[in-house]
């Protein structure tokens, strides 16, 4: 260590405290990294790796910090920001430096690093058989907390459905870290020390939320410890008290339709890397605000199960559908509203920029116009009742911050004139500089008789008097040479040095005073944070309702109606909301189910539209229960407590699970979790094994679903043998996709009708795919032989109805999967 410079010794001492982080060490205009950190940073950011005294070193310009930070965080690293705590020019010895912030993927707050969508993180602990899970978005203040009796695979499914960017685990769950990383490499995982869960949690929670008691919170002590651990972690990373996080709420799963990650993926509800632009979220996203985009995602992931709440949303959408002029007005106004939710979070953390405040002011100026436009519609005139429009906050910003402020106080003008007499005085001194310099220049020209003499300023050398070398012999004795150039000499005089000192003092004073005033501005505005959040939430909801209404008008969606405690479905001329956007002509279809006939076996060849149909029924149910009109001429449907799907074939190479095993595990989840109020959508279950095994399993699954679970189900299959169930069981209906056979081949009409598909048309699909004619003809020969030799029909007709009690007694055996 003796051969290390004082600065490197300082770096190593600070790095020792933050071993798990990349340390960005402020040196002048750069954030430098050293040793192993420098190698990582150089590789990730593709910047030059240099050396300082033989040690690896890589630097980031301070003005481009956010761009580089985002890339480091996206690469899965934790980053500690070490700032200079004093001016290097006035420092005697080594500059004082301290870490002022720690960033992780789940603790980003800076506008330049945030996407519009939520950045959810989670903290997970386990107590007995219960997982205690907190989900939070630091950038918005959203905070959820609940206990779950999950199996490990259910926990992983829950995690994947949220699109988390970071997971915090208690030490006893450390083994989960690897499994989570197998799930996705995009999640940053951190193990928390035990002190985060210390016994002072109640006092700390009461202090944070400024309450005298926690009795009004519906949480046990173990859950409150998790909530407190979240807040402590945020305080540690931000080096400040956390005031903007809302009180945690339970997930209240009974109030929302259950959608697991399989269903979200299978129905194309949210965008993934492979289906961007072609999901339910994408086609409903005509929102105009960032808050509205996040609220739309929240609505889609949590369809309501309470009829009154659904109808309340639908009423608002209907009022907007019937008022196209209001729709257009709101569209224009909402487009001017900035991300108030995140601005309020930054205000609370004292990290809002001057441009944030102007964005807040400009947005608050629009709110009265939004409210005024709603008064023209009796059904919406009370939408903002009880919400503060924050006139005082708007006027305060208006009177304090200039219209086009610098990026931060100290980087240019931020505070308006008239706010501080002292600040105005120093600014006047600074602003009069040109006049002072011109007076000095004029006087020195007259005094020296050097007409070409000029007074100027240089960032390095400061103020100077410039004289050509030809005239330099005329300068008086009081001129002190400062710099020699090729054709000129530069000098200084005592008066110029005094001006420079006064200017430097003025500049420093302006920075200090502006920073002090700005901090007071943020402190004053922090009293409005709760009101800003409430206003933001109402604007977000209005934005979503307006989006639903516009989509409904443009694409001729109709208001759904609901039948409670019934299996009856009457959907006329339904369409797939996404597919219809990408085809020239979409064939609509009907669906009728009743209390007596609620299980459909749907047969038809590949490419005929089976999968599209079952997906559109699922999406229509989701749309209805989020409060949106639906793509159908008429829709009378139940309110489902969950939608369960098994669609598509895939294996799990990492876990060593075959396609069939994955399929059976997913079906097992459905059989365990579905209720008589659920919707089950199955596509080609059983095809991952032999034909006879597949038919047998599919048949048994079907019997269990309609005899024991008694839930609305559509089972799309190639196994035409399954349709014989419609002859044996009154609950089952056989439907098929209509196909027209012509001399030139097969035409898929995509229309559903009663009956059984007699042909899978696999050979015809192969022909359409461009198979050689020799293979097509040979396939026909083989099919003819197999059709003559295999007669499953006679066997299936002999299957007897299995006693329902037998299923009920064996129901627990499903837990083996």
UniProtKB/Swiss-Prot annotation:
This is DNA mismatch repair protein MutS. HAMAP family: MutS. Keywords: ATP-binding, DNA damage, DNA repair, DNA-binding, Nucleotide-binding. One of its GO terms (cellular component) is cytosol. SUPFAM superfamilies: DNA repair protein MutS, domain I (SSF55271), DNA repair protein MutS, domain II (SSF53150), DNA repair protein MutS, domain III (SSF48334), P-loop containing nucleoside triphosphate hydrolases (SSF52540). PROSITE patterns: DNA_MISMATCH_REPAIR_2. ATP binds at residues 604-611. InterPro entries: DNA_mismatch_repair_MutS (IPR005748), DNA_mismatch_repair_MutS-lik_N (IPR007695), DNA_mismatch_repair_MutS/MSH (IPR017261), DNA_mismatch_repair_MutS_C (IPR000432), DNA_mismatch_repair_MutS_clamp (IPR007861), DNA_mismatch_repair_MutS_core (IPR007696), DNA_mismatch_repair_MutS_N (IPR016151), DNA_mismatch_repair_MutS_sf (IPR036187). Belongs to the DNA mismatch repair MutS family. This protein is involved in the repair of mismatches in DNA. It is possible that it carries out the mismatch recognition step. This protein has a weak ATPase activity. GO terms for molecular function: ATP binding; ATP-dependent DNA damage sensor activity; damaged DNA binding; mismatched DNA binding. PANTHER family: DNA MISMATCH REPAIR PROTEIN MSH1, MITOCHONDRIAL, DNA MISMATCH REPAIR PROTEIN MUTS FAMILY MEMBER. One of its GO terms (biological process) is mismatch repair.
């Amino acid at each position: 260590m003796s051969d290390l410079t004082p600065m490197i010794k300082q770096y190593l001492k600070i790095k020792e405290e933050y071993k798990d982080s990349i340390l960005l060490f402020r040196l002048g205009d750069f954030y430098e990294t050293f040793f192993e950190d420098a190698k990582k940073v150089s590789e990730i950011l593709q910047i030059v790796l240099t050396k300082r005294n033989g040690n690896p070193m890589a630097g980031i310009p301070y003005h481009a910090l956010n761009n580089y930070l985002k890339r480091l965080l996206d690469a899965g690293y934790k980053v500690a920001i070490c700032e200079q705590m004093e001016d290097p020019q006035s420092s005697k010895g080594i500059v004082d430096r301290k870490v002022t912030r720690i960033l992780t993927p789940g603790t980003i707050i800076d506008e330049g690093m945030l996407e519009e969508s939520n950045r959810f993180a989670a903290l997970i602990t386990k107590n007995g058989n219960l997982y205690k899970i907190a989900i939070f978005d630091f950038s918005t203040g959203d905070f959820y907390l609940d206990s779950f009796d999950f199996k490990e695979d259910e926990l992983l499914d829950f995690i994947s459905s949220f699109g988390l960017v970071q997971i915090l685990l208690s030490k006893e769950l450390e083994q989960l870290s690897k499994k989570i990383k197998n799930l996705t490499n995009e999640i940053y995982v951190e193990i928390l020390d035990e002190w985060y869960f210390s016994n002072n949690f109640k006092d700390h929670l009461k202090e944070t939320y400024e309450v005298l008691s926690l009795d009004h919170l519906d949480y046990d002590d173990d859950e409150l410890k998790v909530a407190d651990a979240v807040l402590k972690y945020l305080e540690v990373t931000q080096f400040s008290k956390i005031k903007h996080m809302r009180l945690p709420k339970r997930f209240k799963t009974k109030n929302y339709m259950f959608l697991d990650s399989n269903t979200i993926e299978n129905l194309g509800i949210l965008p993934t890397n492979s289906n961007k632009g072609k999901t339910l979220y994408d086609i409903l996203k005509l929102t105009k605000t960032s808050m509205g985009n996040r609220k739309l995602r929240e609505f889609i992931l949590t369809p309501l199960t309470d009829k009154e709440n659904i109808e309340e949303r639908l009423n608002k959408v209907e009022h907007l559908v019937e008022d196209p002029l209001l729709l257009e007005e709101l569209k224009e106004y909402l487009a001017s509203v900035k991300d108030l939710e995140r601005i309020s979070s930054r205000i609370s953390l004292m990290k809002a920029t001057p441009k944030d405040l102007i964005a807040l002011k400009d947005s608050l100026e629009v709110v009265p116009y939004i409210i005024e436009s709603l008064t023209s519609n009796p059904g919406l005139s009370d939408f903002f009742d009880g919400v503060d429009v924050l006139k005082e906050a708007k006027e305060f910003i208006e009177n304090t911050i200039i219209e086009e402020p610098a990026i931060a106080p100290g980087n240019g003008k931020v505070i308006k004139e008239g706010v501080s007499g002292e600040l105005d005085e120093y600014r006047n001194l600074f602003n009069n500089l040109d006049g002072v310099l011109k007076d000095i220049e004029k006087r020195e020209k007259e005094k020296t008789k050097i007409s070409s003499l000029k007074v100027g300023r240089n960032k390095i050398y400061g103020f100077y008097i410039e004289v050509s070398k030809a005239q330099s012999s005329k300068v008086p004795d009081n001129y002190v040479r400062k710099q020699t150039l090729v054709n000129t000499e530069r000098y200084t005089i005592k008066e110029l040095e005094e001006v420079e000192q006064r200017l430097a003092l003025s500049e420093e004073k302006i920075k200090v005073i502006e920073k002090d005033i700005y901090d007071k501005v943020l402190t004053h505005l922090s009293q409005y944070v709760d009101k800003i959040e409430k206003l933001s939430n109402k604007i977000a909801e209005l934005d979503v309702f307006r989006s639903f209404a516009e989509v409904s008008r443009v694409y001729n969606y109709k208001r759904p109606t609901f039948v409670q405690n019934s299996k009856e479905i009457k959907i006329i001329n339904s369409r797939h909301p996404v597919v219809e956007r990408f085809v020239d002509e979409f064939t609509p279809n009907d669906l009728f189910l009743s209390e007596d006939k609620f299980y459909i076996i749907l047969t038809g060849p590949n490419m005929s539209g089976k999968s599209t149909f079952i997906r559109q029924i699922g999406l229509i149910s989701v749309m209805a229960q989020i409060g949106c009109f639906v793509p159908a001429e008429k829709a009378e449907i139940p309110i489902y407590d969950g939608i369960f799907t098994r669609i598509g074939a895939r294996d799990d190479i990492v876990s060593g699970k075959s396609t069939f095993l994955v399929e059976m595990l997913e079906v097992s989840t459905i059989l365990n979790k579905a209720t008589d109020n659920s919707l089950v959508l199955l596509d080609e279950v059983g095809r991952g094994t032999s034909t006879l095994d597949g038919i047998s399993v599919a048949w048994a699954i079907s019997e269990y679903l309609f005899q024991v679970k008694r839930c609305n189900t559509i089972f799309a299959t190639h196994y035409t043998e399954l349709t014989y169930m419609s002859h044996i069981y009154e609950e089952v209906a056989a439907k098929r996709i209509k196909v027209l056979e012509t001399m030139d081949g097969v035409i898929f009409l995509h229309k559903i009708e009663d009956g059984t598909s007699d042909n899978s048309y696999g050979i015809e699909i192969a022909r359409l795919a461009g198979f050689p004619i020799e293979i097509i003809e040979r396939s026909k020969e083989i099919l003819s032989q197999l059709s003559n030799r295999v007669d499953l029909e006679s066997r299936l007709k002999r299957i007897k109805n299995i006693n329902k009690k037998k299923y009920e007694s064996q129901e627990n055996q499903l837990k083996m999967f």
